[in-house]
Amino acid sequence: MILIFTTLACSQVGNSETPENEVVSNDESTSNVAGEAPRQYPTLEPGSDFDKFSLWTNGTQLRGANTWQRLVDPQYDDDDFLGDGYIGPPYTQDDFNGLAALGANYVNLSHPGIFTERPPYVLDEKAQANLDAMIAMAAEADLFVVISFRTGPGRNDFTFYRDDDWFDSDDLIENVWYEADAQQAWVEMWRYTAERYRDHAVVVGYDLMCEPNAVEILDEWEHDQFYADYGNTISDWNRWYPQIVNAIREVDTQTPILVGGEGYSALDWLPYLNIMDDPRMVYAFHQYAPHMYTHQEPPFLTHTYPGKFDADYDGQKDIVDQDWLADYLSIVTDLSDQHGIVMAVNEYGVVRWEPGAVEFMVDEMSIFEELGLNYALWVWDPDWPPWNEGVNGFNFRYGENPSNTEETPNEFQDVIVEFWARNEVRPSDFN
């Protein structure tokens, strides 16, 4: 499974099954987070003029990284691979402090949803306790937070590697794309989440779903054909996500809401996402293009940056360089000009050993800056050796050598830190 581990972004291994009728108890012994975290939320001072949405609208202000966690399943997880808690891998305060020390000022928590994935769709108190602890540690490290739900009613983490064969197909949960009860429960999960965290000073965004993927489930990757066949059906994210937004706004009118498009939130699917009449929306995308370059595995590192290869699956070789990236990312400018919307990149990256990865990152982040986009790198892993030894393709702290699994000074990290050094604002500036 090492190949799986190293090649997937936003998609790490795991099953997250909740037995029917179980509402998990909030028992400290089941927390995935090593150490204790404060339970009291920092809130904005009365009369504070801090507007969370302003962090998304005035040029690039948030530069940081994603964390990744899923529910632990002993059926598929070996020994202490993800730790012995309910969710893993386990993060500590030192992990968040380390992210902040390198200059990041925000973390996108790519986290299991806090309602169960199987019916009855009810609050999962252990998932909620874990999210509380993660937010608390981010706050202690002076980091802004975006909550991004990977899973929830009718969807588990296996959806991100649905065609792999290391788990039983019966454990794959994807009925959220064809069952109204699951979709309504996802709406209620977000209503509950917004009511719980709306006054939290460091929570500056709700990301409704990590990488909507009905296109793969329905096996239709052509944009226009997908919407011709499935537009305005129960499988259409455009039909469903506004219900989530409306539910959030019933209890929280202020916190920015992030939403990505179909196709695993790839940028070329964003123009097909319906724009809502909500003044505090952020339209987000994940940027791993060209995928055949950013996700190569040794020894087959045939594509370089800059380089010449088929980058758009049309059978013709393309010159892939900064101009290619700028042209692809010009979709952002087109959408901004057309709709006047706010956008962000809440996942991006390249596997650390790709030829030319340093130059690729410099060019890509430079374009993000020119476009005024906030951006979160994939991924900031915890210091958990059983995990780090097997899953480290996106761990920039390990440098370009694929066999290295220890932190080492390297140019890849230097480039990232150089961009993070541009951060000027932190939660403590407003409290």
Model-predicted regions and their roles:
Residues T7-A9:
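C-terminal motif of bacterial Sec signal peptides marking the signal peptidase cleavage site
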Residues S11-P19:
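Bacterial lipoprotein signal-peptidase II cleavage site
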Residues T18-E36:
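Post-signal peptide N-terminal segment of mature Sec-exported envelope proteins
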Residues P38-P256, G261-W269, R280, W380-W384, ...:
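Active-site mouth of glycoside hydrolases
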Residues R118-Y121, W177-E179, D224-T233, Y305-D321, ...:
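Surface-exposed cleft-lining segments at the edges of enzyme active sites
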Residues I244, T255-Y328, T333-L335, G340-V342:
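Aromatic-lined glycan-binding groove of carbohydrate-active enzymes
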Residues D321-E400:
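Substrate-binding cleft of secreted/luminal carbohydrate-active enzymes
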